[in-house]
A protein has these predicted regions:
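Conserved nucleotide-sugar donor-binding
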Residues: 4-5, 71-85
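Acidic donor-binding loop at a coil-to-helix junction in glycosyltransferase catalytic cores
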Residues: 92-98
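Active-site donor/metal-binding and catalytic loop motifs
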Residues: 112-137
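A recurrent flexible, glycine/aromatic-enriched loop bordering the glycosyltransferase active site
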Residues: 58-77
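Short, conserved alpha-helix that lines the donor NDP-sugar binding/gating region
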Residues: 1, 99-100
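The conserved acidic donor/metal-binding loop of glycosyltransferases
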Residues: 12-16
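Conserved donor NDP-sugar-binding/catalytic core segment of glycosyltransferases
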Residues: 20-50
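Short aromatic/hydrophobic "clamp" motif used to bind/position activated sugar donors
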Residues: 8
Length: 138
């Protein structure tokens, strides 16, 4: 609610962004798309699985060597969409709830094919369980 920019996104404090993340995202904002999507790696126990976040996937699903996801909290989304789809007041599954809501409003995207985000899963610190179908990546 306190944001003042045209777009809103979340970077989890235990994840890593690519050195060119800001340059690529800021350049993409001129497209005026509802959401900026990108690729990255899901990292668990030093094993990396590539992922792609895009509207073209039409759902969240896993292949043995690739995760496909719809736009979610990691993607810059227009502020007015984010405000109409606020996070629910809970600390488990709130990101999945938000993703489901924003995908009802998003009409177009600007996709960056580069790996910009590295989702660092640690079973010792994460509240997300590996077999949870609501998780952003599992």
């Amino acid at each position: 609610n306190k944001s003042c920019g045209r777009y809103v996104c979340f970077i989890d404090d235990d994840d890593v962004i690519a050195p060119n993340y800001l340059i690529k995202i800021i350049s993409a904002l001129s497209s005026n798309a509802d959401v900026i999507t990108f690729c990255g790696d899901y990292v668990e126990n030093n094993l990396r699985t590539p992922f792609s976040i895009s509207m073209v996937h039409r759902g969240n699903f896993n292949h043995p060597n690739m995760f496909y996801r719809l736009p979610n909290h990691l993607c810059p989304v227009k502020r007015e969409i984010a405000l109409s789809c606020q996070f629910t007041d809970k600390n488990y599954g709130e990101d999945s709830d938000y993703a489901e809501k924003i995908n009802n409003y998003i009409k177009n995207e600007f996709h960056i094919q580069d790996k910009l985000y590295f989702y660092m899963y640690d079973s010792n610190t994460s509240q997300t369980k590996p077999n949870n179908t609501l998780n952003a990546f599992n």
